[in-house]
């Protein structure tokens, strides 16, 4: 079997004990093998390292991505949640290895502009590497979902791991309401305006919407 437009991210817990997390060669390659087996695939299109590892040398992590590509288990390498300076170092290592590094995956929205502050957005442009952003709607805050309270079936009440009452602050809601009024003046929904804002710069290659139900699309 073969993958079509499939990607895999590694950088969080895969198993208990040593090398079960972060960015070591053992972790990345073993977790990729496990994931391919579970998915019933021979390869993924993009294999991401999910986050910077403060303990493992960058050369080891990038070497593992290179090995994944050259072994035929991934077509391209990607990075997720890196800052600009570290991404540039990683890019130089991968270029020297002749490993195709094509994409960064980072959080980006009207409310979260970290990639502008940490240099990732500018560095990606300089290196000619794309950015695919996630949480462009700030987990539903930049839609009409929470403008008038918290619905019973929302992730705030049913899950709460990534969006909870502590993060859904009154300040954010007030800002979202103000943005919603601006969107109305423009003749569009808040969600549409928020997505257009993320895509306004050609540094952003694509956007992961992150819908939880088909009707949200």
Segments the model singles out, each with a brief description of its role:
Residues 12-18, 142, 216:
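A short acidic, helix-capping loop that chelates divalent metal ions and anchors anionic groups
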Residues 6, 35, 44-47, 65, ...:
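Hydrophobic packing within well-folded, soluble alpha/beta domains
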Residues 13-29, 50, 55:
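Active-site mouth loops of central-metabolism enzymes
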């Amino acid at each position: 079997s073969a993958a079509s437009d499939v990607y895999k991210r590694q950088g969080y817990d895969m198993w208990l004990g040593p090398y079960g997390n972060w960015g070591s060669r053992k972790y990345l390659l073993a977790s990729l093998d496990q994931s391919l087996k579970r998915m019933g695939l021979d390869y993924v299109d993009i294999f991401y390292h999910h986050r910077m590892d403060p303990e493992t040398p960058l050369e080891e992590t990038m070497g593992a991505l290179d090995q994944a590509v050259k072994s035929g288990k991934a077509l391209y390498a990607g990075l997720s949640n890196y800052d600009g300076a570290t991404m540039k170092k990683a890019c130089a290592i991968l270029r020297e290895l002749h490993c195709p590094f094509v994409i960064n995956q980072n959080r980006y929205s009207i409310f979260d502009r970290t990639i502008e502050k940490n240099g990732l957005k500018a560095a990606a442009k300089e290196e000619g590497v794309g950015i695919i952003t996630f949480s462009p709607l700030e987990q539903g805050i930049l839609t009409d979902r929470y403008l008038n309270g918290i619905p019973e079936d929302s992730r705030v009440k049913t899950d709460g791991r990534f969006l909870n009452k502590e993060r859904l602050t009154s300040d954010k809601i007030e800002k979202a309401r103000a943005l919603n009024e601006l969107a109305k003046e423009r003749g569009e929904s808040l969600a549409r305006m928020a997505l257009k804002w993320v895509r306004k710069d050609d540094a952003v290659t694509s956007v992961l919407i992150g819908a939880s139900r088909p009707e949200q699309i």
